[in-house]
Amino acid sequence: MGIEEKLPSGFLLTTVEGLAGYVRKGSLWPASFGLACCAIEMMATAGGRFDIARFGMEAFRASPRQADLMIVAGRVSQKMAPVLRQIYDQMVEPKWVLAMGVCASSGGMFNNYAIVQGVDHIVPVDIYLPGCPPRPEMLLNAILTLHEKIQQMPLGVHREEVARAAEQAALAATPTIQMKGLLR
């Protein structure tokens, strides 16, 4: 399409990549995927006390086609996993995923066959946010960490290779239904 795909990443485009990273990090459009108590804390982040609008994210998108950040807040059941994957596939590129809470990150205290033991078995996760549930300040810190990561992301072909590698790692992971936990 443009010059960023014709030249290798970082060649003659460092200032353009820096500008593009600055613009991308300031215009994230989150799609909330709230499934449990973490969703309440995520909604509190949009309130006046914590004011997520400071970072350009005042409106959570209802459609995945309008979002580039998915915040998975809470536990994901095996039946919900295909829906999560479908929503991720419908999001626009470049896209990022934030696993909010210990349930989204590792299954939490639900170590059974019905709960996915980590969202990273379904979609590639960029930021893991621990806590049960994590406080709104922690979510804001995770978003700022994601901003730093976006600022450093290269443009063009190399970015697509990194995304493909993360996707393959997520697909190659052991299915959660076959995992053996502490109680099995």
From Swiss-Prot:
Keyword Iron-sulfur: yes
Membrane topology note: Peripheral membrane protein
EC number(s) from the headed UniProt entry: 7.1.1.-
Cofactor, free-text remark: Binds 1 [4Fe-4S] cluster.
Keywords carried by this UniProt record: 4Fe-4S, Cell membrane, Iron, Iron-sulfur, Membrane, Metal-binding, NAD, Quinone, Translocase, Transport
GO biological process per UniProt: aerobic respiration; electron transport coupled proton transport
Top class in the EC scheme: translocase
Binding site for [4Fe-4S] cluster: C37, C38, C103, C132
Predominant location category: membrane
Keyword DNA damage found: no
Assembly behavior: NDH-1 is composed of 14 different subunits. Subunits NuoB, C, D, E, F, and G constitute the peripheral sector of the complex.
Full protein name: NADH-quinone oxidoreductase subunit B
Organism of derivation: Rhodococcus jostii (strain RHA1)
Lineage: Bacteria, Bacillati, Actinomycetota, Actinomycetes, Mycobacteriales
Gene designation: nuoB
